[in-house]
Amino acid sequence: MSKNLTIVARIEANADKVELVKAELLKLVAPTMKETGCVQYDLHQDNENSAVFLFYENWESRELWQQHMNSSHLAAFIKATEGSLASFILNEMTKLSYA
């Protein structure tokens, strides 16, 4: 089995900040995809609650994901969305089965 790390990040914007949060999340995609170790970095928006976003990420290792967590573009996102998030839940996952 692969040693890749899967990250599922659930971000919920405050009701009045959905468009701001969405724009800032979209800014993360291009620079993150260029990072060493990033295999997949997909952003989703809930069909019924537009304030809910989900990143589905795959990284070559936890160490390389940690480098991402310390990146300047992630720091810029945190600063730009300060006070705009209702919740931010991060899960580190291990893939158990393959289709």
Regions found by a protein language model. Give the residues of each.
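Active-site-flanking beta-strand signature of metal-NTP-handling nucleotidyl enzymes
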Residues: 6-11
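Short amphipathic alpha-helical coupling segments at ligand-binding clamshell hinges
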Residues: 20-24
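An amphipathic, aromatic/His-enriched active-site/gating alpha helix that lines ligand/cofactor pockets
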Residues: 27, 33-39, 58-91
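Short, glycine/serine-rich, charged loops/turns that create anion-binding
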Residues: 12, 48, 60
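Short, surface-exposed ligand-recognition loops at beta-strand->loop->(often short) alpha-helix junctions
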Residues: 13-18
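Short, glycine- and small/hydrophobic-rich beta-strand elements in well-ordered beta-sheets
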Residues: 30-52
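Glycine-rich beta-strand-turn "strand-cap" elements at beta-sheet edges
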Residues: 2-5, 43-48, 78-99
